[in-house]
């Protein structure tokens, strides 16, 4: 089996602790660069687990459109700032973080009290600004998940009162690009070089993300290795599919009226038509005797297929 090499050719930490790395994978057979690159990109962006704030509770607040005395931001703005909070959770169980801040001053993520199972990635992340004498008391729930969770209600009925749900972004990988280059090694036939650029929010290193994505893809295909058993179980079965049944109804060259009626009835191919008897055709809305005769004649002349006159008896 041909082996390819993986090399990290560039790596850096950017603002807000965001991580970036560039990887090179080579040599790959022609066409495999696009196949591997596309699969990795989709899994990196959609299937890796991450942590996010899913709900908050602020003292004296019972809806997201409220304001807090002495706090520059209203509750909705605070919720948006909490949505952008980058966290890492080492447990699958929901965790509760807390904040008690008294003005004047700026509130950042560094002031949060979080369990040992939760890590705040960027302590400088801005939350709110408090005036003299203002007080902000808050609890927030941290959960692990995959992808993006959209709330359906303003309150979390499964939790304590006054907890306000937040649209949660769990995706630790923020951006992925890939390019495929042509290479020639030792005078051999042309090969592919896959260049993969990965950006993360800082809760995971790009090399860790690439490793996890590769595991997910590999595990996805493991069941396909046992197809021999499937073949043995079905060795005596012959699935006889008439290729003519897969022909779209456009090939029958019907009149516009008959064609539109069939389309509205979700009849898109000859296979769909074969589920109907001649009586069934007449029951289609706006499908008269003339249209039915046209379809029956087209099937007979073009494909040698004759529809049964009556519905099959149960």
UniProtKB/Swiss-Prot annotation:
DNA-dependent RNA polymerase catalyzes the transcription of DNA into RNA using the four ribonucleoside triphosphates as substrates. NCBIfam families: PRK05182.1-2, PRK05182.2-2, PRK05182.2-5, rpoA. It comes from the Bacteria. Belongs to the RNA polymerase alpha chain family. Keywords: DNA-directed RNA polymerase, Nucleotidyltransferase, Transcription, Transferase. InterPro entries: DNA-dir_RNA_pol_insert, DNA-dir_RNA_pol_RpoA/D/Rpb3, DNA-dir_RpoA, RBP11-like, RNAP_asu_C, RNApol_insert_sf. The N-terminal domain is essential for RNAP assembly and basal transcription, whereas the C-terminal domain is involved in interaction with transcriptional regulators and with upstream promoter elements. GO terms for molecular function: DNA binding; DNA-directed RNA polymerase activity; protein dimerization activity. Residues 1-228 are annotated as: Alpha N-terminal domain (alpha-NTD). Pfam families: RNA_pol_A_bac, RNA_pol_A_CTD, RNA_pol_L. The gene is rpoA. GO terms for biological process: DNA-templated transcription. It catalyses: RNA(n) + a ribonucleoside 5'-triphosphate = RNA(n+1) + diphosphate. Homodimer. In cyanobacteria the RNAP catalytic core is composed of 2 alpha, 1 beta, 1 beta', 1 gamma and 1 omega subunit. When a sigma factor is associated with the core the holoenzyme is formed, which can initiate transcription. Residues 243-314 are annotated as: Alpha C-terminal domain (alpha-CTD). The keyword Magnesium does not apply. One of its GO terms (cellular component) is DNA-directed RNA polymerase complex. This is DNA-directed RNA polymerase subunit alpha. Its EC number is 2.7.7.6. The keyword Protein biosynthesis does not apply.
């Amino acid at each position: 089996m041909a082996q390819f090499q993986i090399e990290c050719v560039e790596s850096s930490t950017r603002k807000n602790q965001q991580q970036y790395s560039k990887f090179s994978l080579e040599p790959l057979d022609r066409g495999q660069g696009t196949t591997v690159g596309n699969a990795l990109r989709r899994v990196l962006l959609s299937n890796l687990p991450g942590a996010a704030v899913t709900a908050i509770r602020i003292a004296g607040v019972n809806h997201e459109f409220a304001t807090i005395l002495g706090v520059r931001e209203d509750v909705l703005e605070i919720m948006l700032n909490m949505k952008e909070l980058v966290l890492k959770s080492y447990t699958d169980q929901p965790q509760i973080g807390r904040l008690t801040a008294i003005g004047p001053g700026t509130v950042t993520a560094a002031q949060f009290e979080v369990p040992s199972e939760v890590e705040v990635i960027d302590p400088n992340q801005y939350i709110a600004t408090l005036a003299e004498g203002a007080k902000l008391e808050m609890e927030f729930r941290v959960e692990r998940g995959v992808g993006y969770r959209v709330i359906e209600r303003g309150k979390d009925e499964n939790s304590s009162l006054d907890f306000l749900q937040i649209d949660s972004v769990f995706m630790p990988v923020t951006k992925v690009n890939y390019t495929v280059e042509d290479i020639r090694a030792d005078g051999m036939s042309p090969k592919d070089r896959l260049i993969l650029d990965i950006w993360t929010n800082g809760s995971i290193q790009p090399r860790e993300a690439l490793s996890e994505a590769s595991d997910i893809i590999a595990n996805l295909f493991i069941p396909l290795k046992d197809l021999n058993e499937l073949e043995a179980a079905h060795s005596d079965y012959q699935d006889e599919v008439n290729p003519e049944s897969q022909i779209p109804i456009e090939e029958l060259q019907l009149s516009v009226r008959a064609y539109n009626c069939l389309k509205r009835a979700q009849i898109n191919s000859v296979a769909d038509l074969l589920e109907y008897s001649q009586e069934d055709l007449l029951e289609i809305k706006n499908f008269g005797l003339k249209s039915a005769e046209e379809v029956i004649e087209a099937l007979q002349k073009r494909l040698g297929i004759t529809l049964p006159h009556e519905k099959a008896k149960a």
